[in-house]
């Protein structure tokens, strides 16, 4: 991989001998790494809303679904339920089948 650094002087020599072909190949090769260096990185910053446990997923409409407990259980599967205090024991058995047991949220 140390050969790419001396590569820029070589296309100049290939230009005179090979014509525009050497220039096109060198231009395509040079643009690739430059674009890769300018790609933005993804930064995740903590929000100041509600503190969320590590790994807990929340749907954007969770606040609208807090009223009817049955629709919340059907719409928000296990990722948001285990984080609730007091309901972790009840939801442990219904994690995979929360839609099959609609009475589970009514217990707690």
From Swiss-Prot:
Bias regions of kind Low complexity — which residues? 63-85
Please provide an example of a Pfam family that matches this protein in its UniProt record. Answer: Lbh
Q: Which InterPro entries match?
A: LBH_dom, LBH_dom_prot
Domain of life assignment: Eukaryota
* Annotated region (Disordered), positions in chain: 1-108
Composition skew (Pro residues), residue ranges: 1-11
**LBH domain location:** 37-62
Designated name of the protein: LBH domain-containing protein 2
Report the source organism. Homo sapiens (Human)
């Amino acid at each position: 991989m140390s050969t790419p650094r001396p590569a820029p002087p070589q296309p100049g020599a290939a230009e005179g001998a090979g014509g525009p072909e050497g220039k096109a190949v060198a231009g395509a090769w040079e643009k690739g790494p430059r674009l890769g260096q300018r790609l933005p990185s993804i930064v995740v910053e903590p929000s100041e809303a509600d503190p969320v446990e590590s790994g807990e997923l929340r749907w954007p409409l969770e606040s609208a679904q807090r009223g009817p407990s049955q629709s919340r259980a059907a719409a928000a599967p296990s990722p948001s339920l285990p984080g609730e205090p007091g309901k972790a024991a009840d939801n442990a058995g219904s994690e995979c089948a929360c839609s099959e047991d609609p009475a589970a949220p009514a217990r707690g």
